[in-house]
Every structure is written in C-alpha cells, then in structure tokens.
C-alpha cells in the first residue's frame, strides 16, 4: 500500500463494498467526480504551533451530492498513522460522504469521531467496517441534506 496515494483507499473501499454483499451501490460507477487530496499546514501555522483541528474531512459538496466524493486529509497527521489507522480514517470519511452517516457515540464504530486510536487491530477494523456496510451500529444517524428539485 502506497501511503501517499489516497485514491487507492477509495478503490479498496469500492471493492470492499462490492464484496461485502449488501453494502450498497457500485460507488465506483456512481461517483463521477472523485476528489481525495492532502492538505498541508503552511509555515506560519507550523512555527506558531497552530494546525487544523482535523485529520480528515468530507464536505457538503460530497456528502450532499451522490455523484461526488470530496475528502481532504491533513498530511502531517496522516504520515504518522499505521495502515489500519489510515484505512479507519478513510472509511470513516467515506461513511460521511457515501452513506451520509453522522458520528457514532460508540468508540468501536468507524463513525466514532476519534478514530486514530493506537489499539485498533485488523479484526477491530473488519468488524467495524462490516457494521458500517450493513448499517447496523447503535445510534445510527444520517446527515441532513437539502432537497433538490
């Protein structure tokens, strides 16, 4: 896995959904505009100790438009993560963008807001992403998007 190729995480997610059975549509076919990108702290932010308060985010343009995926990732934080943590972060953001999930209150869920814990292992990830695909985690809530005509 190439740590710096964010598109590969999208491709893994799309294939994982297809293989899971019941995970949803073929997001690769459905998504017409894929924008997954790194953000970098500028020199003045670095010197002052100020950095963005998020590691990654999806945006309105993505989660309220079924044809778009728009996810930004803070490179400085990303580069410190192991593979399982990177998968967890990206699946979390795809959960917002593709499934329109809000955050969960259960730390065992991918949709929990702080998902870069060091105690996450491969089995934790598999269980959490399977629950996400099946839409079967407690307190599931969806992002509200405006109706379009």
Positions of the model-derived regions?
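Short, surface-exposed loop and linker segments with low hydrophobicity and enrichment for Pro/Ser/Thr
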Residues: 27-29, 64, 79-85
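Post-signal/leader-peptide non-cytosolic segments of secretory proteins
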Residues: 38, 66-69, 84, 97
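Residue-level detector of short, conserved catalytic/binding motifs and their immediate flanks
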Residues: 86-87, 109
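Active-site-proximal beta-strand/loop segments in catalytic clefts of secreted hydrolases
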Residues: 36-43, 74-76, 93, 112-116
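Short, surface-exposed alpha-helical recognition segments that flank or form part
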Residues: 4, 38-39, 81-82
């Amino acid at each position: 896995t190439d740590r710096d190729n964010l598109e590969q995480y999208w491709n893994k997610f799309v294939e994982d959904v297809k293989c899971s059975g019941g995970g949803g549509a073929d997001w690769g076919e459905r998504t017409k505009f894929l924008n997954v990108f790194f953000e970098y702290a500028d020199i003045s932010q670095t010197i002052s100790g100020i950095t963005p308060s998020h590691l990654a985010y999806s945006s309105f343009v993505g989660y309220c438009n079924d044809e778009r995926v728009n996810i930004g990732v803070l490179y400085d934080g990303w580069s410190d993560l192991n593979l399982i943590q990177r998968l967890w972060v990206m699946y979390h953001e795809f959960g917002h963008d593709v499934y329109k999930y809000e955050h969960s209150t259960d730390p065992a869920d991918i949709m929990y807001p702080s998902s870069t814990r060091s105690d996450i292992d491969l089995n934790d990830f598999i269980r959490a992403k399977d629950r996400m695909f099946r839409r079967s985690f407690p307190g599931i809530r969806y992002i509200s998007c405006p109706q379009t005509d």
